[in-house]
Amino acid sequence: MLMLLRRRCRAWLEIRRLDKELAQSSGLPLELPQIVPNAWNEVVWRLPVPNHPDAFMTASNAAQSDFIVYVNGLAFYRAWLALGVEDSQACPLKQDMPKDRKYPSSAAHFAVGIDSPVPLADVSPTMILGHFAVCFTDGMTRSMWLLAHEVAVFPVLSRDEASAVMLAEHVGVAAPIQVSKLREQCRKI
């Protein structure tokens, strides 16, 4: 019980810190990840990673009807923390993310680079006690890796338009875009 109380307190303090940081950075422009041409004829993004080689992600796991949402890393982290510490998908604090048992596997996948881009996380919005939060169908550890490495903006996958719009409103940096339209744009690159 005491351990759970400590986790709640640490998460609450982190949310407060993030609220201040997000308020201070409000209105500052964030760059979208760059889409790069590739041999697979699929959408692949180059994500700048501070003090590390760039990371590469792909929409190869997306259906044509799915949507891509570019999320602000800090806002996304805050929304994931809002899920609560008791939830099975609870967000660890950034400093604890590398301790996750699957983290080394995600790190290894990101380390391969452009030759094997990492699939996007499949994310859904939810409300917890009146607060916006995010939950996952797939990609929690990939998201931990991005957050632990301070990636400012990254794409996530959303399976329907209403969810994509809600994600974009709360944690997004641009309007959502349907995968079919994005793939069409990529063919023109």
UniProtKB/Swiss-Prot annotation:
Keywords: Plasmid
Domain of life: Bacteria
Biological role: Suppression of A.tumefaciens oncogenicity.
Name of this protein: Protein osa
Organism: Shigella flexneri
